[in-house]
Amino acid sequence: MIQLERAGIERGEIADLFITHAHTDHVLGAIWLIRMTLQRPAPEVLRIYSHKRVLDMLTAVCEMMLPQKLIQRMPDRIQLIEVHDGDRFEVGDMRLQCYDIHSTKEQQYGFTADLPGGVRLVCLGDEPFNAANASYAEGADWLMSEAFCLYADRERYKPYEKHHSTALDAARDAANLHVRNLILYHTEDDHLAQRKALYTAEAATAFCGSIRVPDDLEVIELD
């Protein structure tokens, strides 16, 4: 919530939320958004899109933690929208399609977003690219890929044991998929001051497109 405030984003500006999977670092923030929505004047509504496991977890946590007077408002104020592999839906002026990333650790969905002007953004989720999903990512204008660490530091951070990739792995995937721009995120945080330069340099050895390694609160214009 502090970071939303620092970014100048009001709770009321968030009407739609996509949650990839049920890990705590992805789900717990949604509980605060739900609570704030329920506390604000009607008729504000929050729509949350995800698969059944995530939605069931959100419902259970809210029922255990929120005051009864807020829980009673949920049916009218919180729309939990279950999506399935390959489903298409629209959010504002964006057309989205979600897909199962075929995680062996936790059910997880990525998504594609067709933006105004013909720009296509693809989010791979929280794990490495799976070749089974090549059709979703091929030729994307923007590819969002996790990169847990540098390939040079793989022995220290053990990314493959954690179902994660390196900056070099993500760059190779981006090159093979012929995307225009690569966004690297979900990194270790031991090198924050040098992260942008280090990750960009390693990725550039395998990918010749634009590479972004955003710092917290950095804004990227998708064009």
What are these language model-derived features?
Residues P128-E218:
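Cap/insert and terminal regions of metallo-dependent hydrolase folds
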